């Protein structure tokens, strides 16, 4: 039986096509991936991301605990701020990437990937020490993401809280949005400005409908996982299971900015990651653009001079750039800009070249 979010009941009304995504029955699209993608890049789109996991970490030793588990320096977080981090195994492979919200000293909220909820909880639970309480509240929380250049304008209609005061990677708790109490965070997974909004499960439908109603004039569309994927891909934001996995380290994936090997605390995987930061890695994640006609897809093999040098992690026809592009994890010696490589598509090796990432960056 597939898991469903509290918004499942209203999907049909908005014409959703659902798919099985990591054990969840979720909308891949409402109108079309292209239309939804375009809406987020130019106006705004609303996503149901209630499948994501939320854990509360509380107690006097919670900072010391998180410092041991996280690659980033959690001690740098101040109240009301958000931090991107990763958890790694001893060998540097990735357990998950996640967001850490600091509510107060000794009180944090972790937001993890849906497919990793059980694994992450067990991983954290297995390393608990001292005065730390770890609670999985994923079942109680719904999460909506309103993303795009007009996101603030739309959401502001529903609240008296000044949303412009919530800066990037900051949040405010207990905001009243059209009668619904929510945590509002200026974060997202699209490369655009926008908010991720956390509320109680039972308030999800009311919140969803009031945001779409408020955004009618601006052309806000309900959006599915298809557009979420093409948007995050263009912005070169990693997806666990593709750019990151137990076999791929954050350094290989180009996420060294979130790995603080110089922080005071020791963390799991530190030795390997420190070495990789200092000495480099044998393979690296790069952008590729097809020269020949073809679309690179996840898992396709990449070749150079007749030898296999890696594989595509994500690829698609970019709706914004109108080009066939991909992210590929390949041997470091082939990662210089404009290096010609080949992608094996349906048994044929087709020409591509290494290009700069991110593929898309919004004008500030």
Swiss-Prot record:
Its EC number is 2.1.2.10. It comes from the Bacteria. GO terms for molecular function: aminomethyltransferase activity; transaminase activity. It catalyses: N(6)-[(R)-S(8)-aminomethyldihydrolipoyl]-L-lysyl-[protein] + (6S)-5,6,7,8-tetrahydrofolate = N(6)-[(R)-dihydrolipoyl]-L-lysyl-[protein] + (6R)-5,10-methylene-5,6,7,8-tetrahydrofolate + NH4(+). Pfam families: GCV_T (PF01571), GCV_T_C (PF08669). Keywords: Aminotransferase, Transferase. GO terms for cellular component: cytosol; glycine cleavage complex. The glycine cleavage system catalyzes the degradation of glycine. Belongs to the GcvT family. This is Aminomethyltransferase.
